[in-house]
Amino acid sequence: RRSSDLNGHEVVLWGREDHIADEINQAHTNSHFLPGINLPTTIVATTDLKAALDQATVLLFVLPTKAIRSVARQVASYLSQSDAQPLLVHATKGLEQGTHLRVSQMIEEEIPRQDYQDLVVLSGPSHAEEVARHDLTTVTAACPNLKAAEKVQALFKNHYFRIYTNTDVVGVEMGAALKNIIALGAGVLAGAGYGDNAKAALVTRGLAEISRMGIKLGADPLTFVGLSGVGDLVVTCTSPHSRNWQAGNLLAKGYSKEAIEEEIQMVVEGIATCQSAYELAKESGIEMPITE
């Protein structure tokens, strides 16, 4: 099966909810998460993880941070009994609570190195609904092995989706995770009625503290002026599509954390990441006043 929408790849989606999988398979829509979008008929959905992994050459993790470790453990169990050795890619933006680990570190702890080719981070300013509509989008693929990043670039690129490559996994992941915190602040400013001057100050000073933390952890400073740094920060802080912006906006209006999650109905990574980043900043001696 081939589809120009999918760059010629067969795609199997795994999820936990039967009714969503059934809708994708039968109606080729996902009305809850992508309303108004017609999905390519070559996308197949399943709630059976083993069936999703069978014969897969590339595994793409797009999960809430809190689910990464448990799912990676299940994947590891399958791969240990298989000769597949797929390429792993993740597009999750967050830090693990308690350990403050980046997502790639969590995956590496759970899946033995001999069971996969490489692990690549795919990240950048990319609202899902815009990608699904084929709006122009650019992101970064990062891996210490540049050839693996270039392989992901070749797999995903097309006329509306462009991928740049680099080797700075730390910088790409930290920019992706920490910008969600600044987006919460941007939503708070909007909800409280502040204007563009305040927004500009927040984004600028937010980038400064993201960079300080990333550099402390070994990131390349230049990464933060790229797509996964300032690019992701701008799109998340200025768009009402952003769940983190929405959460901050509701926070300014007096909503509790529980009420915000109930209202948005999707994971708001910035809330959990904020606590992890705050603790990490204290441990590292890094000033992060917006996060605080």
Listing of model-derived features with the role each one plays in the protein:
Residues A67, Y78, M106, E110-D118, ...:
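Internal alpha-helical scaffold of NAD(P)-dependent oxidoreductase catalytic cores
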Residues W14, D18, T46, V62-T65, ...:
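Electropositive phosphate-/nucleotide-binding environments in soluble metabolic enzymes
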Residues N7-I37:
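NAD(P)-binding Rossmann-fold cofactor-contacting core
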Residues T42-V44, F161:
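Short, conserved active-site loop motifs that form the nucleotide-linked donor/cofactor pocket
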Residues A186-A190, I215-V225, G229-E292:
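NAD(P)-dependent Rossmann-like dehydrogenase/reductase catalytic/cofactor-binding core
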